Amino acid sequence: MKKALKIAGIGFGILVLLLIATAAWVQFTPMPTYEVKPPTVQLPVDSASLAKGRKVVELACAHCHLGEDGKMSGRLFSQATDPFGEMWTANITQHPTKGIGRYTDGELAYLLRTGINRDGRVVGPMMCHPNMSDEDLASIIAYLRSDSGIMQPSEATHPAPAYLSSFMVKALIKFGVFKPLPYDGKPISAPPATDQIAYGRYLATEFYECYGCHSASFETNNPMEPEKSPGFFAGGNPVPDEEFNTCISRNITPSKEHGIGSWTEEQFLSAVKGGIRPDGSMLQHQMPRFAVLDDEEVRAIWAYLQTVPPSENNPLRVEAK
């Protein structure tokens, strides 16, 4: 009996030492870095491509990165009470040291594909576009390099995200739960606009990332395979504005009771471009007014959403609590 207890005690002591060693490794060793493999990028110079890049940057990127100086200098994105703590978005102006001025076009493309910055550290995947066409990604980078006022250099600097000092986040990163997105460097093309449903899927899940807000949570979205995101297009995601007021994203699956299954295509177009619901009320301001979208784009998104499995999730019930 004494021998068994002794063996058990030794085993327990070894286990405790292993746990202490693992905790010390998580807490005190450097964060992992990854090899940066910038692809070759040919930036477009035509006005149509710049306009396309402007759409994404000003409709999507600006929501998080537009600072108080009117430039893409970053802003406070989450408060200390947030599960991941206080976090500021990055300065992505053309400043040579405080923005993205040091990045090559290839390094920017690799960052947008994988979430790995030029120093080999993971900073994504919130802003990643792993399935965007090479042509469209180049249009975004071309606009980031343009003479647009919002992209001009800003001196703004921000504190490092609080989550970087979190033991839990460090553990998730070091054990590979949080990791960069894969990228094999193979060419990626967008579907043609003539294939309306495929084109609509591309716009809704990649180019404009509608699913990002309209699925269950930013934290559980799956950028590589958007359809596997929990609550895909069924809403329920608390979306904050610049003053941290939140509204719950709506179910936009074809559910007739809780989604947009009873809407017409024209009503959907009015909601997306003008922010007007079928009953005449206005959408909350967290939902951007996509007035610059072509009708063809909105109709393609509508056609694709009709193919999404209906969900009976009722986000309004969550909001009412």
Residue ranges of model-derived segments:
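N-terminal type II signal-anchor transmembrane helix
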Residues: K2-V36
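Extended surface/linker regions that mediate inter-domain or inter-protein docking
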Residues: G13, L17-A23, P130-R201, E297-Y304
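Electrostatic cytochrome c docking/interface patches
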Residues: M31-V57, K174-T205
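Gly/Gly-Pro-rich "capping" loops immediately C-terminal to redox-active cysteine motifs
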Residues: P44, E68-D105, G124-S133, P159-A171, ...
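The canonical Cys-X-X-Cys-His
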Residues: G53, E58-E68, I140, G200-L203, ...
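C-terminal capping alpha-helices of c-type cytochrome domains
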Residues: T104-N117, H129-S154, T264-G280, P288-R317
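Extended amphipathic alpha-helical interaction segments
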Residues: P187-P192, G212, F218-N222
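Long compositionally biased, domain-poor regions of proteins
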Residues: E206, F233-A234, S270-K273
